[in-house]
């Protein structure tokens, strides 16, 4: 039996040149992999509220929930749980993103995401980002 789903919100921050921001994980079993910024929802938290919090913590930027457009989701078995990744697109924020928790940040075109080592749940979102941006 699979336990309760693990809800994770991710943001595709899109700059004026149509590039998406990815960050490189610095620790844990996924260290070195590139991923879209975001994180787990806390109890009672909406995906948009989680992203506002996570983007502030991880990148030092301010985002308003109205600037987060739900775009897609991906799901992946994760041990005895099921991870559901909720993707939002964001084109407007305040501040300059900085790697506060990640090893590095990189702006890439969606097609370039194919060449990056990314966690399995992020990979199905690449084609969608190519179509959207």
Q: What is each model feature region?
A:
Residues 110-119, 123:
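C-terminal structural segments of small proteins and small subunits
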Residues 123-133:
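Charged phosphate-binding loop/patch that engages nucleotide di/tri-phosphates or the phosphate backbone
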Residues 97-102, 117-119:
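Short, charged, solvent-exposed linker or helix-capping segments at domain edges/interfaces
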Residues 11, 105, 109:
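Residue-level signal for inorganic ion chemistry
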Residues 1-20, 40, 73:
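Conserved N-terminal beta-strand and adjoining loop/helix that marks the start
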Residues 6, 15, 72-96, 106, ...:
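Active-site-adjacent beta-strand/loop module that shapes the phosphate/pyrophosphate-binding cleft
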Residues 19-57:
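Conserved Nudix-box catalytic region and its N-terminal flanking loop in Nudix hydrolases
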Residues 62-72:
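A short coil-to-beta-strand element that immediately follows conserved catalytic motifs
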């Amino acid at each position: 039996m699979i336990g309760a789903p693990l809800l994770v919100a991710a943001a595709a921050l899109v700059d004026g040149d149509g590039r998406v921001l990815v960050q490189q994980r610095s620790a844990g079993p996924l260290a070195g992999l590139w991923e879209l910024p975001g994180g787990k929802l806390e109890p009672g938290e909406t995906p948009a509220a989680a992203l506002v919090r996570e983007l502030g913590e991880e990148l030092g930027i301010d985002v308003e929930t109205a600037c987060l457009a739900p775009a897609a989701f991906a799901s992946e078995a994760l041990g005895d749980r099921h991870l559901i990744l909720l993707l939002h697109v964001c084109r407007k924020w305040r501040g300059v993103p900085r790697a506060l928790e990640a090893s590095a940040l990189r702006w890439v075109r969606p097609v370039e995401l194919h060449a990056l080592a990314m966690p399995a749940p992020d990979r199905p979102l690449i084609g969608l980002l190519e179509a959207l941006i």
